[in-house]
Amino acid sequence: MNNFFQDFNLLFSSSLFSSYMDWFYNFNCSLLFGVLSFVSTMFVYLLLSSFYFKSKKIEYQFGELLCSVFPTLILVMQMVPSLSLLYYYGLMNLDSSLTVKVTGHQWYWSYEFSDIPGLEFDSYMKSLDQLELGEPRLLEVDNRCVVPCDVNIRFCITSGDVIHSWALPSMSIKLDAMSGILSTLSYSFPVVGVFYGQCSEICGANHSFMPVALEVTLLDNFKSWCVGLLSD
């Protein structure tokens, strides 16, 4: 049943948390599809059959019991994995080894590594004439945010003007950036690669040209990147 929803699925999961979210989505879709099939089948059967019910009793206790038990079971089946995901999400925010402050502006992102003095930069979308071979249009930036893999990182999201939203769909990350408010999220990236997202809150004329590019690399490469950026 899960394969049926591949065309309507989330992006390819690149972390443990996003894999759990993907499984939960497929599980709910399969469950709801089963409920829809059962109700539709019963509706068509009763509509086309000559069956009729005749009773002097106004109440039908067994039917009322079924109508109470089955919805309760369905809700319990949804509640158990949902609470497990919520508990796992809470564990992710317990501690962190690196803090990255992300500030949204019209229409670019600013990154500041609070644990590394002087390491801060702005990230703008690359124009068409700046793109190199293989770089995605409207998603590549001039300065990627580089973070090490297998390290718990705390992201502090805020805004310098209007409301923005820092989103990485493949990681199941979406945090609103609001002026005067600091939204935090701790995350560990197990996969090396470059992951793209966009601002997911309409923030003005160039809202569509405000991409997010996060590069996850090995710890040694991250240290070399920090040294190179600080030396510049």
Curated annotation (Swiss-Prot):
GO terms for biological process: ATP synthesis coupled electron transport. Pfam families: COX2 (PF00116). SUPFAM superfamilies: Cupredoxins, Cytochrome c oxidase subunit II-like, transmembrane region. Cu cation A2 binds at residues 199, 201, 203, 207. Its EC number is 7.1.1.9. It is a multi-pass membrane protein. It is an enzyme of class 7 (translocase). Keywords: Copper, Electron transport, Magnesium, Membrane, Metal-binding, Mitochondrion, Mitochondrion inner membrane, Respiratory chain, Translocase, Transmembrane, Transmembrane helix, Transport. It comes from the Eukaryota. InterPro entries: CcO_II, CcO_II-like_C, CcO_II_C, Copper_CuA, Cupredoxin, Cyt_c_oxidase_su2_TM_dom, Cyt_c_oxidase_su2_TM_sf. Its cofactor is Cu cation. Belongs to the cytochrome c oxidase subunit 2 family. This is Cytochrome c oxidase subunit 2. It comes from Ascaris suum. The lineage of its organism: Eukaryota, Metazoa, Ecdysozoa, Nematoda, Chromadorea.
